[in-house]
Amino acid sequence: MNKTQGNLQDLFLNVLRRDNTPVTIYLVNGFQLKGVVRGFDNFTVVLDADGKQQMIYKHAISTIMPFRPVNLMAESRAQAEAKQ
């Protein structure tokens, strides 16, 4: 696996967090959570919904759907240029 593939999840979550993009997170049990991603690490995502924070374990997440499109290609290019 190359480095870009390994960081796709972090890239996606970081863009959502930075842009305060509202998301719906679907859990493996079918439950839906709506809010804004405030932070994440290797194992968890922190979601802010109506002023309340929830820590969700990534192994419980099925799908993350942003309310607006996320341009990962532009973000990936910007990060690559910043490294040069």
Swiss-Prot record:
> Where is the Sm domain positioned along the sequence?
10-70
Q: Which InterPro entries match?
A: Hfq, LSM_dom_sf, Sm
Any one cellular component term from GO for this entry?
cytosol
Q: Say yes or no: keyword Glycosyltransferase present.
A: no
Q: Does the keyword Ribonucleoprotein apply?
A: no
Keywords tagged on the record: RNA-binding, Stress response
UniProt cross-references to NCBIfam families, sorted A to Z: Hfq, PRK00395.1
Q: Which HAMAP family does this entry report, sorted A to Z?
A: Hfq (MF_00436)
**What this chain does, per the record?**
RNA chaperone that binds small regulatory RNA (sRNAs) and mRNAs to facilitate mRNA translational regulation in response to envelope stress, environmental stress and changes in metabolite concentrations. Also binds with high specificity to tRNAs.
Protein name per Swiss-Prot or TrEMBL: RNA-binding protein Hfq
